[in-house]
């Protein structure tokens, strides 16, 4: 199908297409969330490596609503609806797509229904949203960012720019971390997100060239959540005695782990002593002033040869179009919308925090999963 006007400026046509795609961009994450919650990607994965399934085959494998064996039993239009959703994901290389020949010479086999002419499979990208051998994926992160509590805060972004304030606080009347205590379902999604993403990142860190845990005897994870990070670290480094430190209401939900002691408290008051402190995705939640107070508390808790192991994204000074940079800028805006003073930082900003907190400098040790492992040394 040729363009109506072959003399049109192709560059202008492309720019127009890009602008329309941008205007409609919210469609993709909402469709992706529905596909994840319907367990479509899981159904394709369970069909085996390299499997390609038609919409009807996928629909037949999905758990049905209450009282129905499959979703088709309740909604005969489900295969067509799935097809329309999945072809969008294929256009973003989230799924593969192949087309069945409807005019096959094999007269013994019935021609597939029109809705089933497309077959869908998983790309390497899609596999990050299917539970891996550890039962974790990025699916909870996708669902968390689409949670109504977060989505509603974006409607206050304009007002926050005009009047000041934090969008999340404007909507809910309290900071995001306090809101977690109010909404158990939201808290559950948040904790699952932290566990899954931490497990994925931690495994990559432990498989990387980073050797910073080898000489550590006592490791304190500040803001360690339910302790999954320390469980992985101590499993790989059994010589380490670890303290998982977080707010008391978080620690109450933490399961027991060998070599890990759970301690509740307030990191802005004090932190437990150790010869190394781990902080992963902590500093980006807080303003510079809060970070300096926290870092000074860490400085007091460490011996002269102690260090903080910081795991965070590091912003480039100049924006570029790489996926890593886009992800960091998106996370930076998540922080701005949800946390007072929360932000991603550049190398220079991390150095200013380190020296302001009493540390001599920073070593940028290893780059894993778009994150830097940094050491703040005394």
Q: Positions of the model-derived regions?
A:
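N-terminal accessory segments
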Residues: 1-178, 213, 358-361, 366-370, ...
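Residue-level recognition of alpha-helix initiation/capping sites
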Residues: 35, 80-81, 224, 289, ...
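Short acidic-aromatic active-site loops that bind/stabilize oxyanions
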Residues: 30, 187, 191-199, 336-344
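C-terminal alpha-helical "lid/dimerization" subdomain adjacent to the S-adenosyl-L-methionine
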Residues: 311-356
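Conserved adenosyl
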Residues: 2-6, 132-326, 361-366, 371-373
């Amino acid at each position: 199908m040729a363009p109506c006007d072959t003399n049109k400026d192709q560059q202008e046509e492309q720019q127009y297409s890009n602008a329309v795609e941008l205007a409609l961009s919210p469609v993709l994450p909402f469709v992706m969330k529905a596909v994840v919650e319907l367990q479509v990607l899981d159904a394709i994965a369970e069909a085996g490596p390299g499997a390609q399934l038609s919409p009807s085959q996928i629909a037949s494998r999905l758990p049905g609503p209450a009282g129905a064996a499959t979703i088709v039993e309740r909604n005969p239009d489900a295969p067509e609806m799935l097809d329309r959703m999945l072809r969008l994901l294929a256009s973003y290389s989230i799924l593969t797509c192949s087309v069945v020949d409807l005019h096959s010479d094999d007269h013994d086999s019935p021609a597939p229904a029109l809705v089933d002419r497309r077959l869908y499979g998983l790309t390497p990208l899609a596999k990050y949203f299917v539970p891996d051998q550890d039962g974790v994926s990025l699916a909870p992160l996708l669902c968390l960012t689409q949670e109504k509590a977060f989505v509603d805060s974006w409607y206050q972004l304009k007002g926050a720019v005009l009047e000041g304030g934090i969008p999340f606080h404007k909507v809910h009347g309290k900071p995001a971390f306090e809101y977690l205590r109010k909404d158990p379902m939201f808290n559950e999604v948040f904790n699952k997100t932290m566990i899954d993403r931490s497990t994925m990142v931690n495994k990559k860190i432990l498989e990387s060239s980073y050797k910073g845990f080898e000489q550590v005897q006592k490791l304190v994870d500040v803001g360690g959540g339910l302790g999954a990070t320390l469980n992985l670290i101590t499993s790989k480094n059994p010589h380490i005695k670890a303290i998982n430190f977080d707010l008391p209401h978080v620690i109450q939900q933490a399961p027991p782990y060998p070599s890990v002691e759970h301690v509740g408290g307030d990191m802005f008051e004090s932190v437990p002593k150790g010869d190394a402190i781990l902080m992963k995705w902590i500093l980006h939640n807080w303003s510079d002033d809060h970070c300096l107070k926290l870092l000074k508390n860490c400085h007091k808790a460490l011996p002269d040869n102690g260090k903080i192991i910081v795991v965070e994204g590091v912003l480039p000074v100049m924006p570029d179009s790489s996926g890593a940079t886009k992800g960091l800028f998106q996370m930076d805006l998540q922080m701005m919308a949800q946390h007072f003073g929360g932000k991603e930082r550049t190398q220079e900003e991390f150095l200013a925090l380190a020296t302001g907190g009493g540390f001599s400098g920073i070593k940028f040790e290893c780059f894993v999963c778009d994150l830097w492992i940094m050491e703040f040394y005394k």
